[in-house]
Amino acid sequence: MFPMVTGFMNYGQQTVRAARYIGQSLMITLSHANRLPVTIQYPYEKVITSERFRGRIHFEFDKCIACEVCVRVCPIDLPVVDWKLETNIRKKRLLNYSIDFGICIFCGNCVEYCPTNCLSMTEEYELSAYDRHELNYNQIALGRLPMSVIGDYTIRTITNSTQTEIATGKRFDSKTITNY
């Protein structure tokens, strides 16, 4: 008789424990129910990147002196710099400059150490391609300025909470994530 009573007691304790766990998880779920979603509808809404965002590299051909500092500071020796020495003026003439963004780790060392500031990071992060060879950008493709997300009227931009806080001077909680 006692084993049967202890079995019922154990069953009752396990039932109470299971009900408590279900109640706790239900409370957590219900506490998240009144919040706004934090996901964005990607092609139609885009997040404005921060000032220090490291996107695609922009290259200005006219400023480059072919010093190859960018190649030396790159952890994977990625930029390909082709140049020719002009003997009459004793200077290097840049022939070709290319970066393969399929291999680039976007560390920003090339931009930081460039003595003539011919390299800069843009806010462009959409570098998808069907063929990996399309990610090898030459000086013409690197020289194109990306279209700004802010200027595109077809896309609704969503600012970060820190950017909105700085602009408006008031603090937002997790329920207010958009600027409309």
UniProtKB/Swiss-Prot annotation:
GO molecular-function term, one example from the UniProt record: quinone binding
EC number: 7.1.1.-
Residue ranges annotated for the 4Fe-4S ferredoxin-type domain, each copy included: 55-84, 95-124
Residues binding [4Fe-4S] cluster 1: C64, C67, C70, C114
Any one Gene Ontology BP term: photosynthesis, light reaction
Subunit structure, interactors included: NDH is composed of at least 16 different subunits, 5 of which are encoded in the nucleus.
HAMAP family for the chain: NDH1_NuoI
Entry protein name: NAD(P)H-quinone oxidoreductase subunit I, chloroplastic
Lineage of origin: Eukaryota, Viridiplantae, Streptophyta, Embryophyta, Tracheophyta
Gene name of the record: ndhI
